[in-house]
């Protein structure tokens, strides 16, 4: 586990999971990119992490559970998991869009994934954390108040 902002990829197809990992690694340098094809292994990994911040790329329809159930299962460790998730689906129906809206998930990409769309979604989530880090660097009092939490 790195000290950076990692990307965690979960797709029940190991080939797709690996391709997404490799694609993200071509443009992402702020942390590690790890991939899983089994939801339970991804949950175990996430719950054992030291930090509760990451970017998630998750398939909507997994074999053992829905991608939304996966997000819900790690929400105590990752309070912003829904806002930091990019959901992917082979068929982005109105029901899937409604589930994203109900879960506070902003990003939904349809397979086959367009590399630029994935890059923009990942960069958008990354920018949120980079902007917050800049605020902490410019405001020592804010940084001190947060560190005491």
Q: Where on the chain are the PLM-derived regions?
A:
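Two-component/phosphorelay signaling modules centered on CheY-like receiver
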Residues: 14-36
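Acidic, metal-coordinating helix/loop segments flanking the phosphotransfer/catalytic sites
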Residues: 35-55
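Acidic catalytic/metal-coordinating carboxylates
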Residues: 38, 66-69
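Short amphipathic alpha-helix used as the core "switch/output" element in two-component signaling
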Residues: 44, 68-81
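Alpha4 helix (beta4-alpha4-beta5 surface) of REC/receiver domains from two-component response regulators
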Residues: 69, 82, 92-107
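C-terminal output helix
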Residues: 113-122
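CheY-like receiver
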Residues: 123, 127-149
């Amino acid at each position: 586990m790195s000290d950076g902002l990692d990307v965690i990829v979960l797709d029940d197809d190991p080939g797709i999971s690996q391709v997404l990992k490799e694609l993200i690694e071509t443009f992402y340098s702020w942390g590690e990119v790890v991939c899983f094809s089994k939801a339970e292994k991804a949950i175990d990994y996430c719950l054992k992490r030291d930090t509760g911040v990451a970017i998630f790329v998750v398939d909507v329809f997994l074999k053992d559970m829905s991608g939304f159930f996966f997000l819900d299962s790690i929400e105590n460790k990752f309070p912003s998991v829904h806002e930091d998730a990019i959901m992917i689906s082979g068929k982005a129906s109105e029901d899937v869009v409604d589930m994203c809206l109900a879960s506070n998930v902003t990003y939904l990409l349809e397979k086959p994934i367009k590399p630029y769309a994935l890059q923009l979604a990942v960069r958008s989530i990354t920018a949120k954390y980079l902007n917050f880090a800049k605020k902490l660097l410019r405001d020592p009092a804010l940084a001190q108040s947060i560190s005491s939490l």
